[in-house]
Amino acid sequence: YICSGALVNNTAEDLKPYILSAFHCIDLDIPVTEKNLNKYTFYFHFEHTGCENNSSIASYRTITGCKKIAGIPLDGGSDGLLLLLNQTIPEHYNAYYNGWDRSNTAAQSGVGIHHPSGDYMKISTFNKVARTSTWYGIDNIKGAPNAHWNVVFEQTANGHAVTEGGSSGSP
């Protein structure tokens, strides 16, 4: 199963390697066991060196293995997943830790950094206030009321920004 995720800092700011993603990214057909989590592979800097798909590929790095810290299912919840990598991220990976806060203030603008269909990194931009919404999906799945952010992506030079399978879990 391919998804996106974000490396997030914690209040201790000690660079503990937490990954925030989407709960539905865990393949529910495969049991979430320590053995299986130790096979999860995380890619860093999986991107092109420029904005065009024909630009050269950057040197990416990987880390394998994690522990599940917390998960909130999509059905009746917010579809959240928090993982902890089994090892610290080497400094030479030049990894970026996302910040966060507990406020209820919606983002006025922002970007979604993601890997649609497992592709190299893409960036989707929004410039309208994110609004809370309830997720309604297939198979009568309904998220918790107002537990999701709804954003409208902007048009870009090559069309418009989108997300697709593999983008789930992106910041």
Language-model regions, residue ranges each:
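Beta-propeller and closely related beta-sheet repeat lectin domains
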Residues: 4, 169-170
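A short acidic Gly-Thr/Ser loop motif
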Residues: 11, 165-167
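Serine endopeptidase catalytic core focused on the charge-relay Asp
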Residues: 1-156
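Short pre-catalytic strand/loop immediately N-terminal to key active-site residues, enriched for Gly-Thr
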Residues: 157-164
